[in-house]
């Protein structure tokens, strides 16, 4: 993934450079035309850049340069305009990076806000469910125990049975028949 990011970064840099190039060119032209701009804005950075560059080159080659001849005004103005153009491109690129960073931060804050809202909603739901659970537990504890319930059901059956017995009309009693009075006579009815 990192390897794929480098060409994209280079392409992004080239795109920003192309977009800011016209702006840099206009600034360069203004610097060349205006004496104030040339004298106070372009020349000092150009001379400083030339001095640092020459000093570094001399030290790398092993020479000890005590004085460095400054650039002539025309070369310094040209170098200053180029530096100003490159600085403009750099500032535009930095501005793009800052804008992208702030956009990502804003997006991250929004996402975190959504996550916090979802968390709060879940926490509220859990709190609500805890209250419902407590209410249900209170109802279960208030209900009679299962043994008492079975006992009440048995009592209800007994009461119903008693009510059913009382509601039935009394059954007529049968009168005893002669056959029922004693053992049957073996001789009777054998003629």
Swiss-Prot record:
Q: Pfam families given for it? A: OPA3
One cellular-component annotation, GO? mitochondrion
Asked if the Swiss-Prot or TrEMBL record annotates the protein with the keyword Magnesium, the reply is no
Q: Which family does it belong to?
A: Belongs to the OPA3 family.
* GO BP: any one term: regulation of lipid metabolic process
Keywords (A to Z) from UniProt: Coiled coil, Mitochondrion
What name does the UniProt record give this protein? Optic atrophy 3 protein homolog
Q: What is the purpose of this protein?
A: May play some role in mitochondrial processes.
Positions the record marks as coiled coil are: 120-143
InterPro entries registered for this protein in UniProt: OPA3-like (IPR010754)
Its main localization is mitochondrion
Subcellular location field: Mitochondrion
Identify the PANTHER family for this entry. Answer: OPTIC ATROPHY 3 PROTEIN, OPTIC ATROPHY 3 PROTEIN OPA3
Task: Name the segments for region: Disordered.
Answer: 163-191
């Amino acid at each position: 993934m990192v390897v794929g990011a480098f060409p994209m970064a280079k392409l992004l840099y080239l795109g920003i450079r192309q977009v800011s190039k016209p702006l840099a060119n206009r600034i360069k032209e203004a610097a060349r035309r205006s004496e104030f701009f040339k004298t106070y804005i372009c020349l000092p950075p150009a001379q400083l850049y030339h001095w640092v560059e020459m000093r570094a080159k001399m030290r790398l080659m092993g020479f000890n340069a005590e004085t460095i001849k400054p650039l002539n005004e025309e070369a310094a103005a040209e170098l200053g305009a180029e530096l100003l153009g490159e600085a403009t491109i750099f500032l535009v690129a930095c501005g793009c990076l800052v804008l992208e960073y702030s956009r990502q931060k804003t997006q991250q804050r929004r996402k975190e806000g959504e996550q916090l809202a979802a968390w709060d909603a879940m926490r509220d739901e859990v709190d609500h469910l805890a209250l419902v659970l407590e209410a249900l537990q209170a109802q279960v504890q208030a209900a009679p125990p299962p043994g008492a319930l079975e006992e009440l059901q048995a009592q209800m059956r007994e009461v119903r049975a008693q009510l059913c017995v009382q509601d039935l009309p009394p059954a007529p009693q049968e009168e005893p028949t002669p056959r029922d009075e004693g053992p049957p006579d073996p001789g009777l009815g054998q003629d």
